[in-house]
Amino acid sequence: MTESIPKKPLKKGSLVFIDKSIYDGSVEALASDQDLPSYIFEGPGEILSIKEEYAQVRWRRPVPDVWFKLDQIKEYIVSE
């Protein structure tokens, strides 16, 4: 059933979270701190900018914005 729902492209302003299974196997994970905060995997973060295959994400916390590859980012769906 979910296969029939078209996937919306991520864009500026989209609410997102990081897919832990994809991130853990990436080159970026190997080059970064192994103890990442859980909020990046729970979301939501907001996409501020997209450049080629990377997106700059801002979290609703007093922390710096972070760049992630688009394939590591999933849309955050707000449950009503």
From Swiss-Prot:
It is found in: Cellular thylakoid membrane. It catalyses: a plastoquinone + NADH + (n+1) H(+)(in) = a plastoquinol + NAD(+) + n H(+)(out); a plastoquinone + NADPH + (n+1) H(+)(in) = a plastoquinol + NADP(+) + n H(+)(out). Its EC number is 7.1.1.-. Pfam families: NdhO. Disulfide bonds: none annotated. One of its GO terms (cellular component) is plasma membrane-derived thylakoid membrane. It is an enzyme of class 7 (translocase). Keywords: Membrane, NAD, NADP, Plastoquinone, Quinone, Thylakoid, Translocase, Transport. It is a peripheral membrane protein. InterPro entries: NdhO (IPR020905). HAMAP family: NDH1_NDH1O (MF_01354). NDH-1 shuttles electrons from an unknown electron donor, via FMN and iron-sulfur (Fe-S) centers, to quinones in the respiratory and/or the photosynthetic chain. The immediate electron acceptor for the enzyme in this species is believed to be plastoquinone. Couples the redox reaction to proton translocation, and thus conserves the redox energy in a proton gradient. Cyanobacterial NDH-1 also plays a role in inorganic carbon-concentration. Belongs to the complex I NdhO subunit family. This is NAD(P)H-quinone oxidoreductase subunit O. It comes from Prochlorococcus marinus subsp. pastoris (strain CCMP1986 / NIES-2087 / MED4). The gene is ndhO.
